[in-house]
């Protein structure tokens, strides 16, 4: 996943867009868990809050669900 720090598109939107594309194209399948929020934030060198905002956008769209204590799973 690539993040453009100087883009006009907010970082959380860049993340949610790339994950959405991967889900809709079958790269990430139904039943798969997304990377942990902390792990993705660490890997991308961004804040946990930014990653959480991206994941919550996908929840709002119905693409993923939050599973308490486990993470985010693709619907």
Task: Locate each region found by the language model.
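Extreme N-terminal segment that seeds HTH/winged-HTH DNA-binding domains in transcriptional regulators
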Residues: 1-33, 39
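N-terminal helix-turn-helix
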Residues: 33-65
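Beta-hairpin "wing" of winged helix-turn-helix
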Residues: 27-32, 60-69, 75
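Residues at secondary-structure transition points
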Residues: 6-10, 14, 49, 61, ...
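Positions that flank functional sites
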Residues: 38, 73-74
